[in-house]
Amino acid sequence: VNEEVVVYGAVILNGEPKYKKLVGNWITDGDYYVIHRFATLPSFQREGLARIFISKVNSMCEVEKIPSIKVDTNFDNTPMINLLSSMGFCICGRVNYGGNRGQRFAFEKLSIAMEPAD
């Protein structure tokens, strides 16, 4: 917005090795996009920009035929947990990064590529 980065996230194909050691069960076992380091400037929070960002990732999945999107977040990150839940993400378990990062909730959502056609 006005040449200022207001939303940032890294979108990586199959890019989280810790997800192989999930305490829980993923919905899918195939390719996925992971969203990491996701942030919105405080002055732009609650304006729907995070929702738009995640929707764009879902569109990428449709074009590239990637079955799902995975995200992890801190247990106390209520805004992100609520956003993911409202967008159809399911809590699949916990991922442990160790050290200061510790454990986090792990979410997954089937992408548009996996939704049945009408």
Language model regions located:
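Conserved beta-hairpin
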Residues: 1-9
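Short beta-strand micro-motifs in enzyme catalytic cores
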Residues: 31-33, 101-108
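Active-site beta-strand termini and strand-to-loop segments that position acidic
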Residues: 1-2, 107-112
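Conserved acetyl-CoA-binding loop-helix of GNAT-fold acetyltransferases
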Residues: 40, 46-59, 82-86
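Conserved acyl-donor/pantetheine-binding loop and adjacent beta-alpha core of acyl/acetyltransferases
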Residues: 9-37, 45
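Conserved catalytic-core motifs of GNAT/GCN5-like acyltransferases
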Residues: 72-73, 85-104
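Conserved GNAT acetyl-CoA-binding A-motif
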Residues: 54, 61-73
